[in-house]
């Protein structure tokens, strides 16, 4: 059994403790971009996300969440980054920049911390369409010592609307060619960011499409 294999591995190793984890029934994932700057720590509106084979494909902001979930998610993200920044400052560093905090929302509504990326996050590309300052602008300003306040991370999309980003993944070998760009950009509320990647070898994320819709259904249609 798995338990016996775990015990055998522990007996063969040079450690005396093991970690036993319970099954966490996952419903969905959230990303909370958290910014540490000279003005302190602020959190962005939670971002919903969808993955394929463990890789980002789509994200949207604000995430669709029950009452109170957004604030609980932001509190967890803030606490995690506060701890990281405290360690950085104890080592003589500033700890400034954007942190992508990933969270698990379980089927019972509870929220678990998953991991944190000390940099702009792929799911955060949606902020190029949703916020006053994108995650990239926030990161640059923060590490340059400029203050970041809640006003800097405010959503700028119309009330009740949703912004979304979708990764454009190209399969093949050689140069990538984009077609029908004009038709895609003719749709109101859309944008396209093509990355400066000259070639594809296998599967590679080559661009991201951005859109703003009046609702999550509208976002999906766009």
What would you call each of these model-derived segments?
Residues 54-64, 115-128:
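Short, flexible active-site loops
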Residues 1-85, 188, 213:
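Active-site nucleotide/adenylate-binding loops and adjacent lid/helix of ATP-dependent enzymes
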Residues 35-37, 104-106, 195:
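Short beta-strand micro-motifs enriched in acidic
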